[in-house]
Design a protein with these regions (language model features):
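Sequence/structural signature of long amphipathic alpha-helices
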Residues: 1-59
Length: 59
């Protein structure tokens, strides 16, 4: 849903800001885990947007 995609995009933004502010305190392993989370959240948003675009193109 739009609400879910919006929430996931906001989560990516918050996580990214946390990395910017605290990058010196994050070790390589944690950074790898965080990158995986960002990838998952952002890909979910991208898939939703592409699906919606496809639906609108069919109308």
């Amino acid at each position: 849903t739009l609400a879910e995609a919006s929430l996931q995009a906001q989560q990516v933004e918050v996580i990214s800001r946390m990395i910017e502010r605290n990058h010196e305190e994050i070790d390589d392993h944690d950074l790898s885990v965080i990158a995986g989370l960002i990838k998952q959240l952002s890909s979910n948003v991208a898939v939703w947007l592409m699906t919606e675009e496809e639906k609108r193109g069919e109308q």
